[in-house]
């Protein structure tokens, strides 16, 4: 399958003062679904994230997500596996009408303090289409084979 570049949405961004010198968010491989986001922490004062704690880490950019899309902020698998670092409320959603700096809510689920340095790849963002549904209140749910079964009702 060939992806035609002219059909891809354009992601406009604004570099903030704390983002000066950082690489632009980028896809690290040809087939990558997410672009890596980097930490825009002070180069002289890395952020130490103790075990069991969380921190809001700036990226140094304002993103203009195209209308009809969202930015899904997700953990990086290597940080999660090697250090227990993950994103809370994952995936976090960056709405198309948000115009503030994108920040990443990181949590340390590991056993040791983790140091977040300037420019470190801390998360990935997937640009995905969204659908806004019409909401209609009804008086009874339609019948299905599953019914109200949940939480493992279809098997483990």
Swiss-Prot record:
State the needed cofactors, names only: Mg(2+)
A Pfam family recorded for this sequence: dUTPase
Could you say which residues bind substrate here? 76-78, 89, 93-95, 103
| CDD domains reported for this sequence | trimeric_dUTPase
Q: What InterPro entries does this protein's entry cite?
A: dUTPase, dUTPase-like, dUTPase-like_sf, dUTPase_trimeric
Task: Give me the reactions it catalyses.
Answer: dUTP + H2O = dUMP + diphosphate + H(+)
Kindly list the biological process annotations in GO that this record carries.
Answer: dUMP biosynthetic process; dUTP catabolic process
The enzyme class is hydrolase
- Report keywords, A-Z: Hydrolase, Magnesium, Metal-binding, Nucleotide metabolism
GO MF annotations, alphabetized: dUTP diphosphatase activity; magnesium ion binding
Question: What does the sequence similarity comment in the record state about its family?
Answer: Belongs to the dUTPase family.
The task this protein performs is described as:
This enzyme is involved in nucleotide metabolism: it produces dUMP, the immediate precursor of thymidine nucleotides and it decreases the intracellular concentration of dUTP so that uracil cannot be incorporated into DNA.
Which PANTHER family does the entry link to? DEOXYURIDINE 5'-TRIPHOSPHATE NUCLEOTIDOHYDROLASE
Protein name per Swiss-Prot or TrEMBL: Deoxyuridine 5'-triphosphate nucleotidohydrolase
Please name the gene that encodes this protein.
Answer: dut
């Amino acid at each position: 399958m060939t992806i035609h570049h002219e059909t891809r949405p354009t992601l406009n961004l604004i570099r903030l003062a704390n983002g000066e010198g950082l690489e632009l968010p980028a896809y690290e491989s040809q087939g990558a679904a997410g672009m890596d986001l980097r930490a825009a922490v002070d180069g002289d004062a890395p952020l130490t994230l103790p075990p069991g704690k969380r921190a809001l880490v700036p990226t140094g950019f304002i993103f203009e997500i195209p209308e009809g899309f969202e930015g899904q902020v997700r953990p990086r698998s290597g940080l999660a596996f090697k250090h227990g670092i993950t994103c809370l409320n994952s995936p976090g959603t960056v709405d198309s009408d948000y115009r503030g700096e994108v920040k990443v809510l990181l949590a340390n689920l590991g056993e040791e303090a983790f140091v977040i340095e300037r420019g470190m790849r801390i998360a990935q963002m997937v640009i995905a289409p969204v659908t806004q549904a019409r909401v209609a209140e009804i008086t009874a749910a339609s019948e299905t084979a599953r019914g109200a079964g949940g939480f493992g009702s279809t098997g483990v």
